[in-house]
């Protein structure tokens, strides 16, 4: 039985597909959904400018918590509009470590993430690491 679905998001198009999949899954099982994100505090505005030009999978490195808040809020609102019990959490750190840690913290039964990586031909490093270290089942959504 699935009671809690966790999903990693950063607001990217790839993450949006994983979020939609996770919302559908939570709705089907009448489960709670937790939207998770990782960020690294930006030390100056030049890093924020650089983040706009960076590939999606590394943009988190230039973000701060304020940058991930809209993605989490939008996802939470979408879930609540469909009648789901939804919460969010963001934490500073490397995405795969943060997702694994927070999935465990929230006692997730399943963790949903997108498949897109830096090299568009192979599974991304975050989903690859998460699939090996997560404390729960992992669903990797094909987004490309």
Please identify what each model-predicted range represents.
Residues 34, 87, 139:
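Conserved beta-strand positions in the Rossmann-like core of class I SAM-dependent methyltransferases
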Residues 31-32, 84, 108, 136:
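Short glycine/serine/threonine/alanine-rich loop segments
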Residues 37, 115-116, 142-143:
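Short secondary-structure boundary segments
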Residues 51, 74-111:
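Structural beta-alpha unit
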Residues 110-132:
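Glycine-rich, Arg-bearing micro-motifs that act as flexible, cationic patches
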Residues 54-70:
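A short acidic, glycine-rich active-site loop
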Residues 3-55:
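Small/aliphatic-rich secondary-structure junction motif
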């Amino acid at each position: 039985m699935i009671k809690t679905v966790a999903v990693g998001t950063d607001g990217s198009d790839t993450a949006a597909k994983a979020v939609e999949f996770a919302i559908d899954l939570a709705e089907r099982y009448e489960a709670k959904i937790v939207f998770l994100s990782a960020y690294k505090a930006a030390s100056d505005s030049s890093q924020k400018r650089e983040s706009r030009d960076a590939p999606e999978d590394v943009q988190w490195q230039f973000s701060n918590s304020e940058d991930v808040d809209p993605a989490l809020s939008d996802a939470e609102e979408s879930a609540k509009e469909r009648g789901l019990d939804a919460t969010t959490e963001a934490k500073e750190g490397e995405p795969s470590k943060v997702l694994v840690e927070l999935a465990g913290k929230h006692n997730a039964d399943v963790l949903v993430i997108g498949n897109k990586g830096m090299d568009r031909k192979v599974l991304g490093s975050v989903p690859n690491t998460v699939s090996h270290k997560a404390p729960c089942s992992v669903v990797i959504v094909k987004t490309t």
